[in-house]
């Protein structure tokens, strides 16, 4: 009887921290892979134009509006990553697409894409965003586990806490990213 009760309450096989670190490593690897995808001239031209339109749009905003624009974009992506299991696939797609956009932007400016990717490691907002995304994808996995174990209340409480944390982190990252954008644009 006691053994069955312990089995029902068994925790997820690894700690939350380890799961976040695994998701963080996977996101970095997938983003890096995106910087090596083949790019044809038409795609490069179209994506490069879109990136420049976004930069131009942000350039015409004041600092707070630019921060809110960046924040809302990143938060929407991050919230989708909380969806059990689907969120991990979506998050990896976002990371692959980000790597691809980095590659196209780098090639447009005649800079080696891996160098641009690695240089992002110096940007604090890069790490804050990545940790937020890894936390959301991890929580999506833990939501699935909680639903499987029928621990709805605990899972909901944990999820709301993580949503609050990543929201604060992404707002901070957006302020830093906007500051970098205006300082070096």
Region spans (language model):
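Cytosolic juxtamembrane amphipathic/interface segments immediately preceding
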Residues: 2-15, 65, 76, 152
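N-terminal signal-anchor transmembrane alpha helix
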Residues: 10-45
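Alpha-helical transmembrane segments of multipass membrane proteins
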Residues: 26-30, 77, 169, 173, ...
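Transmembrane alpha-helix/helix-exit interface in multi-pass inner-membrane proteins
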Residues: 35-42, 82-108
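Membrane-interface interhelical connector segments
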Residues: 40-63, 104-118
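Interfacial helix-start motif at the membrane-water boundary
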Residues: 56-85
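Alpha-helical transmembrane segments of helical membrane proteins, especially in multi-pass transport
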Residues: 120-143
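Terminal transmembrane helical module of multi-pass membrane proteins
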Residues: 139-185
């Amino acid at each position: 009887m006691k053994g069955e009760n312990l089995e029902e309450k068994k925790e997820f096989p690894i700690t939350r921290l380890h799961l976040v670190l695994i998701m963080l490593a996977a996101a970095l690897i997938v983003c890096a892979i995106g910087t090596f995808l083949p790019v044809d001239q038409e795609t490069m031209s179209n994506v490069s134009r879109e990136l420049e339109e976004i930069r131009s749009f942000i350039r015409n905003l004041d600092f707070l509006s630019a921060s809110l624009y960046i924040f809302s974009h990143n938060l929407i992506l991050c919230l989708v990553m909380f969806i059990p299991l689907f969120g991990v696939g979506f998050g990896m797609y976002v990371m692959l697409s980000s790597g691809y956009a980095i590659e196209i932007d780098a090639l447009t400016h005649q800079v080696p894409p891996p160098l641009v990717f690695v240089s992002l490691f110096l940007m604090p907002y890069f790490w804050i965003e990545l940790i937020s995304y890894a936390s959301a994808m991890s929580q999506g996995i833990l939501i699935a586990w909680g639903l499987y174990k029928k621990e709805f209340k605990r899972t909901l409480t944990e999820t709301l806490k993580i949503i609050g944390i990543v929201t604060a982190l992404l707002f901070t990252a957006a302020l830093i990213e906007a500051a970098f954008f205006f300082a070096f644009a």
